Curated annotation (Swiss-Prot):
This is Protein RecA. Residues 326-347 are annotated as: Disordered. It is found in: Cytoplasm. Its main location: cytoplasm.
Amino acid sequence: MDENRKKALGAALGQIERQFGKGAVMRMGDARAVRGDVEVISTGSLQLDIALGVGGLPKGRVVEIYGPESSGKTTLTLHAIAEAQKAGGTAAFVDAEHALDPDYAEKLGVNLDDLLVSQPDTGEQALEITDMLVRSGAVDVVVVDSVAALTPKAEIEGEMGDSHVGLQARLMSQALRKLTANIKRSNTLVIFINQIRMKIGVMFGSPETTTGGNALKFYSSVRMDIRRLGAIKKGDEVLGNETRVKVVKNKMAPPFKQAEFEILYGQGISHEGELIDLGVKEGLIEKAGAWYSHNGDRIGQGKDNVRNYLKEHPELAAELEKQIRDKLLPGRAPSSEAQGTESGQEA
């Protein structure tokens, strides 16, 4: 670039900075240096953290989790909230469905005393509260449960049979236009839970769609499709569900990766079950018939017994997790560990 053009560009950049503040325009190399590695919040599932490619859900971004009823959508977000709190962060839950179970949330490791909860009356109120929490810059993760329950004020105040075509889609589109810049600026993770609906008269392709129009699909950096695969049984007793999450959109890493894990009733995602599956897959645990061994020592017969063994020996579970993370997520410690290291350095 010749000198005159350099001077003209420098003058323009100076004027933009004076008018709109420092950092309004910067060179991509500078932006990368300022931003560094993307900050993430763990999902509470080791397999899903690996499938996401960056070790968790990215902060400063919009994430959508959708799936059929009772597939584990709220469970997954409560685990993410618990992980954010473990790392010293603040979390908020906008409960538009008015269905949050505090006892279950506590069992998953959520600190109820520190969790901010809102049960708004209308969709506009829910999204306005979300925007105000984001703009405060003091909240690390905001969960909206769910998009389908964000009922526009006009619909609530109208009669039962009234037609309100496209109202919810317009509401979501307007809210996301306003929210995205604030989300990026405050480095807040905003998770929208969504439900599935069927499109009528679809001959080819999937008839499934999500509620609230197309805006959320465009604004989301990560979209995850969560499905229940089958029941986990002990005799006739059902202990939980086998669950699969497919990352259908990912702006942070290659998409379309899948994670399979177990959700146990009253306990949430089985961390030990994931360690067993990944340990066998990566050759850290040897499996011969029904027996599992680690470094030549037998640790149990059957997955259920090995799960109990790992619960009783947390040091072995921690060692396995470290080996798996070092192998599959090199250079990415879980957020709670990273936070602990930082506080140790500050001290």
